[in-house]
């Protein structure tokens, strides 16, 4: 691996050639199947681990396919021969899928090596907790309480895949690999037009790499402006919107600023900015004025449209005032709550009452969206009335009960950071009654007769689990009080959003 690592290293200027020649080298098989590389990444590749891909994709088949394509001296296969033109028992659609899978694995090799070297020893153990979704909420509670405005941006998806390929030109200097990438993408979708399947296997790893490259280029420009502006505390953002003649504009601005506008120095100071990206959205939190927030909105719209050729509507950028509006963030509704405090101060014989206001970030449970998800998965109707889960009636009673209990515990576990947990009672009620109706439907009985026959102890597991964990964390006296249901608990083992559809 040390021999390959030197070959795959990136230099600081990012002027390296791409990894396209690795398709024709024998030791790519060693790299693709080396377990040490996967341990560096801590996440084994879909190409190597997924059972559906293990039996189908092979770098050896890819090499044979490429050699065959060059021997035929034609890369475009006629559409009428799609069914007849088989290679190793597969059709042409499979060829481009297979090449794109291996292509995604290869381009991730240098990133895996770089990531592995940065997390050596105990550094990876310390950073593992930071992977939890809940780890960001304590940070937001500490930082957002000092800010007043948030820019909620929906990152646009390119309509055409050619835009994604063109984005790679800024980082990839090997023209042959870009042509090969473009060829695979176009031929893959040309085959899809004639090979329509209800459940066709796409390559999420390949398109995720293209999308991340697209977003990374956008963020590099944004961070460039942010980094430059952080060293110019008296410079307006208005000057930083364009990259052309950047330093010339800064120098000219200083001349105008010193001569004519010394009184507005405080208004143009660069505030602190926090940037968070998640699930195709980004948040820009700052303590700006409404005028500067509108300028940031104008900047994002023009950046996507002019620089990336992506149509971006201004309606996708929302300016929210945290004291008035709710911010939808990772399944929570977050907003700033003002807690008035009255402090009595006594000095000698005189006493004073001091009114103080404490700003706190409040994270609430979006009860309507959760009920909507439950209704989508047929646990209840759109009004929140429980219905039986007909598709589960063929399972055993213990299996049905375990599924409902698992979903209920996952929801309680994820929304433990809310200060108002009473909304969870309604979710638990829907799941409990849905479970009873499902079991009663399976046994061809009514809900009343089913509960009378088995007793209420059947649903005790819905009331335990999360409560048992809380009883171990807090003292008994504190646990018995009602204050426990107002305490926020952030767990460091939640690595993904709980999807109600993922209940199998």
From Swiss-Prot:
One of its GO terms (biological process) is RNA splicing. It comes from the Eukaryota. Disulfide bonds: none annotated. The keyword Chloroplast applies. GO terms for cellular component: chloroplast. GO terms for molecular function: RNA binding. It is found in: Plastid, Chloroplast. Keywords: Chloroplast, mRNA processing, Plastid, RNA-binding, tRNA processing. HAMAP family: MatK (MF_01390). Belongs to the intron maturase 2 family. MatK subfamily. Usually encoded in the trnK tRNA gene intron. Probably assists in splicing its own and other chloroplast group II introns. This is Maturase K. It comes from Cardamine amara (Large bitter-cress).
């Amino acid at each position: 691996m040390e021999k390959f690592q030197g070959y795959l290293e990136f230099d600081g200027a990012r002027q390296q050639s791409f990894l396209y020649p690795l398709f024709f080298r024998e030791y790519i098989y060693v790299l693709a199947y080396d377990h040490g590389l996967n341990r560096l990444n801590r996440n084994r590749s879909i190409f190597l681990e997924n059972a559906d891909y293990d039996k189908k994709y092979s770098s050896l088949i890819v090499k044979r396919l490429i050699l065959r394509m060059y021997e035929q001296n034609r890369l475009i296969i006629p559409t009428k021969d799609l069914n007849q033109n088989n290679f190793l028992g597969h059709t042409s659609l499979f060829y481009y899928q297979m090449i794109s899978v291996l292509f995604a694995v290869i381009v991730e090799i240098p990133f895996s090596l770089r990531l592995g070297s940065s997390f050596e020893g105990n550094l990876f153990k310390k950073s593992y907790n930071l992977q939890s979704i809940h780890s960001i909420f304590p940070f937001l509670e500490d930082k957002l309480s000092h800010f007043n405005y948030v820019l909620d941006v929906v990152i646009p998806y390119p309509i055409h895949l050619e835009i994604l390929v063109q984005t790679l030109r800024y980082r990839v200097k090997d023209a042959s690999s870009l042509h090969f990438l473009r060829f695979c993408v176009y031929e893959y979708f040309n085959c899809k037009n004639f090979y329509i399947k209800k459940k066709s296997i796409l390559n999420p790893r390949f398109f995720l790499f293209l999308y991340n490259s697209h977003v990374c280029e956008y963020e590099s420009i944004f961070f460039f402006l942010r980094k430059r502006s952080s060293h110019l505390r008296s410079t307006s953002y208005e000057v930083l919107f364009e990259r052309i003649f950047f330093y010339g504009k800064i120098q000219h601005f200083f001349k105008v600023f010193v001569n004519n506008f010394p009184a507005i120095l405080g208004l143009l100071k660069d505030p602190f900015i926090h940037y968070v990206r998640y699930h195709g959205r980004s948040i820009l939190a700052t303590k700006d004025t409404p005028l500067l927030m509108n300028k940031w909105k104008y900047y994002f719209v023009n950046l996507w449209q002019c620089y990336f050729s992506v149509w971006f509507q201004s309606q996708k950028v929302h300016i929210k005032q945290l004291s008035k509006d709710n911010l939808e963030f990772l399944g929570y509704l977050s907003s700033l709550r003002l807690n008035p405090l009255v402090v009595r101060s006594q000095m000698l014989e005189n006493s004073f009452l001091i009114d103080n206001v404490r700003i706190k970030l409040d994270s609430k449970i979006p009860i309507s969206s959760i009920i909507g998800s439950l209704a989508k998965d047929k646990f209840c109707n759109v009004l929140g009335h429980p219905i039986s889960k007909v598709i589960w009636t063929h399972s055993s009673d213990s299996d049905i009960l375990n599924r409902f209990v698992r979903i209920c515990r996952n929801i309680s576990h994820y929304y433990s950071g809310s200060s108002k947990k009473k909304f969870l009672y309604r979710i638990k009620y829907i799941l409990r009654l849905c479970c009873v109706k499902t079991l009663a439907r399976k046994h061809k009985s009514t809900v009343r007769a089913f509960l009378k026959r088995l007793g209420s102890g059947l649903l005790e597991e819905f009331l335990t689990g999360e409560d048992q964990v809380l009883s171990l964390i807090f003292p008994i006296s504190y646990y018995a009080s009602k204050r426990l249901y107002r305490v926020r608990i952030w767990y460091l083992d939640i690595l993904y959003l709980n999807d109600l559809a993922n209940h199998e």
